[in-house]
Amino acid sequence: MTQKITVLYAVLLSMALWGCGGGGSSDSVSDKVWYVVGVSIPMSNTTPRSCKLDVDTFADTCADGEFLLDHTTPATFTLTRVDTNTDPGTLALENYTIQYVPMNPNSPVIPSLTVYHTQQLKEGDNTVTLEVMDVERKTTFAALFNSGQQSMTILPVGYTAAYTFNGHNSYGQSWTYHAQAPIFVGEYNECVPCN
């Protein structure tokens, strides 16, 4: 069975809704609310394990060898126009940072990752391939266990992948929003690679 977990619904503001100081809102471009943004990441609880958010950090010895690649997953960014009488333009996703927040404070620290990825987002559903963890972080994580600094008995280790997305809209204004998803990092001992 596959379930879709919505990790964020937020009103995306191009700039502050209210002016500083006295007075109310204005009708300038900088004060508009253009879209309501939803971000969803598909998750699966099927057997065998899901390749969506289970991150395999160990390259196993298989007939052909297990490939150790950057781990990615598809995400759907849904943009719903707030005012149907105006042209909201598009949003450009320019980069995002992932903070790996351990579910157990005694878990190994995984350094944050910044990904420079430019993609135009338009009204409706937009599929974006998100990095979950790159090979550098996978091999650093695995080295802690291979060297004996961490015990294999704690695997898999749960983290919250906290994403901060940054970009600009068609009017050149900056925007930022946040989403998060649980990931489980470990040794899955499978010879069918997940990328």
Predicted features along the sequence, with ranges:
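Bacterial N-terminal signal peptides that target proteins for export
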Residues: 1-8
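C-terminal motif of bacterial Sec signal peptides marking the signal peptidase cleavage site
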Residues: 16-19
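Non-catalytic macromolecular-recognition regions in eukaryotic signaling proteins
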Residues: 21-195
